[in-house]
Amino acid sequence: MRTTYMAKPNEVERKWYVIDAAGKPLGRVASEAAKLLRGKHKPEFTPHVDTGDFVIIINAEKAVLTGKKLEKKMFYRHSRYPGGLKAIPYGILMKTNPVLAFEKAVKGMLPHNRLGRKLFKKLKVYAGESHPHQAQKPEIWQF
């Protein structure tokens, strides 16, 4: 009888990938990043093991939101005090802090447990063109 292959954490080879978000919808870039972080693009994907790669997202400020999401979609946070709910439209958030918009989108697409928190640490988002990870020799991910 054959058994399903289960990857072990020390057997996994990790690569670095760069995703250019310029002119692409935020959600599509975020879903590709989540797929790479989980390792679902690899044949040795194992759901309960970190088999994913490192992901660098550049040009976060040049990403687009389709439809009327810039005005209608809101970013919520709460101070945990009564009346402490803050609501910021994504149009303002993308101008002031596009990195936070990408991090929130990708984090929502990862598992909501210890593994997801570990995977999220392998995501690096930068608003501009440059990034400090040239020494890792990242590959460009096209989709």
From Swiss-Prot:
Cited HAMAP family: Ribosomal_uL13
GO MF, any single term: structural constituent of ribosome
Pfam family, one: Ribosomal_L13
Keyword presence, Ribosomal protein: yes
A GO biological process held by the record: negative regulation of translation
Assembly behavior: Part of the 50S ribosomal subunit.
Cellular component terms per the entry's GO annotation: cytosolic large ribosomal subunit
UniProt-recorded name of the protein: Large ribosomal subunit protein uL13
SUPFAM superfamilies, alphabetized: Ribosomal protein L13 (SSF52161)
Record family assignment: Belongs to the universal ribosomal protein uL13 family.
Keywords: Ribonucleoprotein, Ribosomal protein
InterPro entries linked: Ribosomal_uL13, Ribosomal_uL13_bac-type, Ribosomal_uL13_CS, Ribosomal_uL13_sf
Signal sequence annotation: none
Keyword Ribosomal protein found: yes
Summary of the function given for this chain in its UniProt record: This protein is one of the early assembly proteins of the 50S ribosomal subunit, although it is not seen to bind rRNA by itself. It is important during the early stages of 50S assembly.
